[in-house]
C-alpha cells in the first residue's frame, strides 16, 4: 500500500446486508475491506444489529449462513470500537441510527456509508462524511 492511507469507514446495516446478500454497488465494498483498502469499524451494538437483521425471515438465512457471514466475511476485517452511550439523541427522528455516528466518532472514521435518509440528510457529522455506497465508491 505504500504511503496510501487506509480509509476508516462505518457501514450501516442496510449497506452491509445489501453487500453480503445482493452484491450490486454495495457489494463493491467487500473486496475493498478484504484487500485492506478500507478498514470498517463497528461497535458491539452495530454487530448485534447486523446479526439481528440477518435473522429476518425475508432473507431466509439459516444459522450456519449467519455464522459464516459474521465469522468469515465481517469480523476478520472489521475493527470493533468501544462506544459509550450518547449524552442525548443526535438523530431525533431515529435515535437508533446514533450508534453509527458514535462509532464513527470513537473510531475516527473518515466516512459513514449508508442508505438511510436520516443519516444521509446530515451529509457529515463532526467532519465525518456520510455518503451512500455509490457516492463512496465514486469518491475513491
Where are these regions (language model features)?
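Metal-dependent nucleic-acid phosphoesterase active-site entry motif
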Residues: 1-27
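Helix-adjacent hinge/juxtasegments
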Residues: 53, 58-84, 88
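Acidic, PIN/NYN-like endoribonuclease modules and their adjacent C-terminal/linker elements
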Residues: 107-113, 117-140
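PIN/NYN-family metal-dependent endoribonuclease catalytic core
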Residues: 11, 27-57
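A secondary-structure boundary/capping signal
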Residues: 12-13, 42-43, 115-116, 132
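Active-site neighborhoods of divalent-metal-dependent phosphate/nucleic-acid chemistry enzymes
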Residues: 77-111, 117
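A short secondary-structure junction motif
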Residues: 16-23, 44-66
